[in-house]
């Protein structure tokens, strides 16, 4: 990996703005998620609190790349020591290689998924190293899911690209959730509200992250 080449490829934003902070900084792929992390720092939280809140919020407003159904890893530096948290996900315990002889099963539907580790990693990090109450960590993501966020150009383009795949799933569950009226892509700037996800996150907030794996969820 050529670090110098990567750094030289970075370009400043068109407005030439930069961010400066004395006590902490949060960076993510979506403004609402970044705000969630900053909110934790303002409440007196540490870097772990900010990272956990940011990750949960990304799962709401960046569903194409983040979410409760994904896998996550973490690298942290605490008290002079560095730690890596391996959240690589695995196939369900009852899965068998014969399931995946069909190419479609390897790409689409529930059989193509692995056991999600994202929430377990976030919960572990918060339990072990976090400072703020768990409910405060989850609160921003609940609010974003309830109030919604504006669909980006990338999300619109991905919905168009994957439209056939969405509609090919027998249950149409993905189409009902991610497409407008379950049929067509959202337009850029449309507000995307996720009431079901807000309820799920509210349960996670109230009962802890383990409810996702061992509880009613």
Sequence positions of predicted segments:
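Noncatalytic scaffold domains of N-terminal-nucleophile
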Residues: 1-35, 39, 47-214
């Amino acid at each position: 990996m050529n670090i110098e080449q990567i750094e030289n490829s970075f370009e400043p934003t068109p407005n030439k703005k930069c961010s400066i902070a004395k006590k902490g900084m949060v960076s993510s792929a979506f403004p609402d998620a970044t705000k969630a992390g900053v909110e934790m720092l303002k409440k007196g939280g540490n870097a772990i609190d900010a990272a956990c809140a940011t990750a949960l919020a990304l799962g709401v407003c960046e569903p194409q790349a983040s979410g409760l159904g994904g896998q996550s890893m973490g690298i942290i530096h605490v008290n002079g020591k560095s730690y890596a948290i391996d959240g690589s996900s695995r196939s369900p315990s009852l899965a068998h290689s014969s399931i995946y002889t069909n190419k479609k099963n390897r790409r689409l539907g529930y059989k193509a998924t692995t056991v999600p580790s994202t929430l377990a990693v976030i919960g572990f990090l918060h339990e072990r190293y976090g400072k703020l109450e768990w409910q405060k960590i989850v609160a921003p993501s609940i609010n974003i899911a309830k109030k919604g966020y504006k669909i980006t150009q990338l999300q619109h383009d991905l919905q168009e690209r994957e439209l056939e795949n969405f509609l090919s799933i027998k249950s149409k569950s993905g189409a009902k959730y991610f497409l407008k009226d379950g049929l067509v892509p959202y337009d850029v700037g449309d507000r995307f509200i996720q009431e079901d996800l807000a309820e799920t996150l509210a349960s996670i907030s109230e009962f802890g992250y383990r409810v996702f794996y061992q509880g009613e969820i």
